Amino acid sequence: MVDRLADLRFDGLELGGFKPHPNPDDLATGEQRAAVRERVAEAGMAFSGLAADLWSQKLINTTDTTDYIRCFRKNAQFCVDLGIRTIRVDCVQPPTILAEVDEESARRRVVQTWKRCSQEAADKGLWVTWEFEPGFAFNKPSDILRIVDEVDEDNFGVLFDACHAHMVAAVGARQPGRKETLPGGAVELARRLRGKINHIHLIDSDGTLHDNETSTHAPFGEGELNFDELLPELNKAGVPHDWWTIDLCFWPDAWAVTERCKKAVDELNRKYGG
């Protein structure tokens, strides 16, 4: 995979920290982790971030998030050892969980936990980025704005995935109760989140869900997004680094469209890159 991405002239890759990929449990020693870091560097690349495997943990429907924090801490050290500056989190549990736990308690629990995680990550020089999406709780625009404000840590921000932003802000997919969308869709959400976005995933959206769970990550040109409107706004977001990550999550035979997506992002970079 590393060699193939290097052949396509990628600058790096984003690591899913779960089997069969490199993860903190399988790479338990400093030597093993150093070898992975060196392998990527030898190919002329680096890691843009880590999607930490926190999905086996409970975050919303528990009064004790100690295990979640412990798992986060393990992944944060993994980031340090691999030279990764950004660690991704999400709400772990689906929006239907809010039928079991009252929303106020759930949000408070998420905010307090992520605040603690962000403080520990800051001590390690890491950014914490929250990927909101239809498939997880707190998937309304007002939820996103409120939670990032309440966590209120300099190294905590939002992962703005273009397809999730469209499904949340334009479609209102899987939102419990009254649907909440924005007239300007993803672009308006990006505008409202200026100064609060610290990571970006670029991919198209066809307005559908994958398996009725989370956003379909459609290759560029197969969706509804207007990147000529979105990218100028994202350039105003104040993201603290220059990574743009192509996200083909759940796309069948992703390798078949990776080169095409890379060319699409290269063109966006020529037009809007700093």
What positions do the PLM features span?
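Short beta-strand segments at enzyme active-site cores
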Residues: 14-15, 47-52, 85-92, 126-131, ...
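Short acidic/histidine-rich active-site segments
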Residues: 202-204, 243-251
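Active-site acidic/histidine proton-transfer and metal-coordination neighborhood
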Residues: 41-42, 58-160
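Acidic-and-aromatic substrate-binding clefts and catalytic sites of carbohydrate-active enzymes
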Residues: 18-32, 56-66, 94-99, 134-140, ...
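N-terminal pre-domain/capping segments
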Residues: 1-86, 115, 153-157, 232, ...
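H/E-rich (His + Asp/Glu) clusters that bind or coordinate divalent metals
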Residues: 223, 230, 235-237, 242-246
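Non-membrane alpha-helical structural segments and their capping/turn regions in soluble enzymes
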Residues: 30-34, 62-73, 100, 104-112, ...
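Acidic/histidine-rich catalytic cores of soluble enzymes
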Residues: 13, 50, 115-219, 224
